Structures are given as C-alpha cells and as structure tokens.
C-alpha cells in the first residue's frame, strides 16, 4: 500500500488489490493543444513533422486540471518551460506528448519504489492510435508497450469483470486471456531510453520548483 496516496488503492476481484496512477489530463492535453491553440484537427499531420526524439529542449507540465498521481495537487497547472525565439511549433507539440509520457513515468516510479516489478505495459484509447506517442512512451518508461485491440479501457474491463461474476469464466486471468488481444508491441530503443532518462530527471525538478507559485 502507498502511505502517501500517490497511487490509489482499490479492492479488486479474487481478493486482490488494484493500484492506479491517475493523470487528470493525458490525451486531453493533446486535444487542448491541437483544438484550442493550433486550431487544427490534423493530429497525425502535426505529429508527422516531428522527426527527432530525445533532444527537445522544451518541457511541458501536463497539469491542465491539477494533478492526482503522484502530487495530489488540485492547484497544479500546466506550463511550457525552456522556450526561446528558435522554438518551433513542432517542438511544442512534441513537448506536450513527452510531458504526458513523463507524467505517466511518475506513477511508474511510485510503483517501482513500492517493490512492484513491471516489465511491460498495455495501452488503449485515442492516444494508442499515435505511433509517435507510443514510441515516446516506450522509451520514457523503458518498457515494451502492448497495444490492445479494444479502444475502450475502463468499460471493457468492467464488462470482463461482469462476465467473470456471471460465471462465464472461471477467473479474471482466463477471461483476460480470451478477451484481451494484443495487436501491436512497441519496444524501447536503448539510445532513446538514455536520452529520455536524462530529460525525465530534469522534468521531475519542475513541479517542486513551481509548486509554491500555482
């Protein structure tokens, strides 16, 4: 259990517990940036212009609605850091995608500090449609990222639990084996992992530095 409540703990099926890291703004950060700032629906086209990973000097804090994991701070706010006269549209778009990945990494670090061994992760939903974002997440986390067939994460998971509860499956594991299908796996690249590790260590310093100003 997490004594600081950086992760949320829930009773799960079969007497187990579910630990959840909750970001209040993840894919919605990209939607806000594209819709409200860039005024475009061409999400894929904007991302196609990003060609170099791991070297962006612009950082983005993904706290549009405050943040839960790991900060539990409703007053936290989003911010761009590191811009100059040379900063491009593509670099800021990339910073948004990377900022969300760094936020996910924050929860991963809490879990690891609790002694939880994590070797790979699964992804679904709107963000899973972006090859670039999946690649960034894999390298920021240094994990294999499995993309599952269903785009509906919470709803699909609830349906699986209901099927187990109704006796359609013997247990959760057998239901998942039957109903959750991996359609793609994105693997981290050692060179990019090293670059993103350096950038993540910088990212971690920005929230504590700005906390008193939010």
Label each residue range with its predicted role.
Residues 1-214:
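Active-site core segments that coordinate phosphate-bearing ligands/cofactors
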